Amino acid sequence: MKNIFKTFIILAASFVMAGCLKSIDDTGFDPQTPNISFSEENLSIDQNGGELKVQLNSNLPWRVTSDAAWLTISDENGLEGKELVLTVAKNRTRKERIATLTAWIIADKPVKMTVSQDPTPAGESFTYYVKVDGDGLAEGFTWETATTLASAMEKAADGDKICVAAGTYTPITLIPGGETEEERTFEIHSNFTIEGGYPADAVTGAVVDPANNETILDGVGSAYHVVVVSAAKDNTPAVLKNVTITGGRTHTANQQTYRQAGENLVDIGLAGGIYIGKANFVMENCKVIANAAALAAGCYISPNAEVTFRQCVFQNNSADSNGGGIWNAGGTLYMYDSVVAQNTCGQQAAGYYSIDSGGTITVSRIYNTLFLENDCTQKNEKRSGGALYIRAGSDAVFVNCTITGNKAGYGAAISGHGTGQEAAKLSNTTFFNCTITGNHANNGGGGLFAYNVGAQITAYNCIVSGNTSSGTAAEAGVMDGVDANRVLVKNSVLGSSLVDATGGPVGGWGFSTSMLGELGYYDNSLTKCFPLVVSADNPAVDQGLSNADLQAVAGGFSPAVDMDLLLSGQNAIQRTKKSIGSYNAK
């Protein structure tokens, strides 16, 4: 009986299913044809920005994107048609800008609309005046009606200038997308100039005097980035002058959490002091001191940025991992008469770090700069790059520089580190007229050191002497198994010898560090250097390359080496005869 009942149930279920299938087959399925469109093809808005509304018509689920960071969309996807709210940032540039919205149901059949925004009118350049006790509601057009720094920076557009009185300023404005107090920063969002160094009680007619009127931008140990440069790259640069940047402290771990500032994705673990996005940026007479970060404690330079530092100091910055002082990740840096000193890191590159980013070559042209007492051994005695750590995809040239007192496991003055593959992009470093002395490596390369075959280091007309190593290659050398020609020292002083164009010793000459004077300011120097002790037996005084020979070997670089600076020396004395090192003998 049970078997008969089970059979009956199975047969009944089969009839029901068959009926359902027949019903489905009879009715069929008629998918909708995708239909999507914007209610407008073009919209425009004035320079001040704000909100726009547009209807997106769609009969099926859709997605929409904007190709511009300055235009955001309330909804990036939906199931059916919807009114979208477009938020447009203020246009502080002198150019009209256009964004394109792209919407689709099927990816290969999108629809588009454009949003154009008026520029800030040409000729409307303003100067704003800022004091510590300024009024945030004041217009800020005179010292007597001074405003706050946050207010002035919010108002400023391309071509404007902000004059800042002496005192200490802390950031109060969140980076775009920021959520916590630590994300407050001074954002240089446009190509304007900030100039500190005016008297605290400045009145109309006050004259800038930075030596007596220190202007401090202070992150008070909590701001992830004291300064963020997010201005769009333009022929006219953003400029920062006569300020001290201090007290930055990024997130303690590199969490790869990003904020969109202009066209830049800013990592909260990078750059406690100053984060430089894809911008044309000039910094003059500034100090970046006592900042901390997971990575790039003092300064981070983004890919495709073009940056100039003049008479700047990067000192006492400390990274938990790589990059104590400056980290250049695919930018072009011109640095003049500056100091990179006493920076530390837990891993590589205490002083200056150069590495390509996504295939973008990192370019460095560094003149008359002192690299002093940078140390990457405090947490791990084997780490590389005390003063300089030059990685794959780098084109670095150092002219008239002094590198002294730096410490590392490998490469106290410089560690060149390529990919380890001969055919890959090299780490290329060239020194002209540099003095490299008094650096110490725990493992190898107190002076010049190539870590692998991907590195090439060449020194012309340099003093490389008085460097030490507890391992190998006190003055210059390579890692075991690496071709010795990866480090070349030509027409220079190397250790106790004068060497010729082949790197071989020149008979009849010797050298010791007693032939160098005390580190200090000499003649017209803006940074400290070692003078030469003038004596008949000091080869650095009248040997080395002639002016013509120097210009010849330095003539093939792009960007070009500045020939005037090449011949002027770190002591800013025109070279009238042969001499070796950063100090031009008289």
Question: Where are the model-predicted features located?
Answer:
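Bacterial Sec-dependent N-terminal signal peptides
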Residues: 16-42, 111-125
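Surface-exposed binding patches on compact interaction domains or structured appendages
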Residues: 38, 57-85
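The right-handed parallel beta-helix/beta-solenoid scaffold, focusing on the short coil/turn
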Residues: 84, 99, 111, 126, ...
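A short beta-strand micro-motif common to beta-rich folds, especially ectodomain repeats
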Residues: 94-107
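Acidic Gly/Asp/Thr-rich repetitive segments characteristic of extracellular carbohydrate-active
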Residues: 131-176, 185, 226
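Extracellular beta-strand-rich solenoid/capping regions of secreted or surface-exposed proteins
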Residues: 150, 171-193, 202-242, 246-280, ...
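Predominantly extracellular beta-rich ligand-binding scaffolds that present long acidic/polar faces
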Residues: 172-191, 203-208, 282, 308-311, ...
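C-terminal accessory segments
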Residues: 224-228, 498-499, 503-586
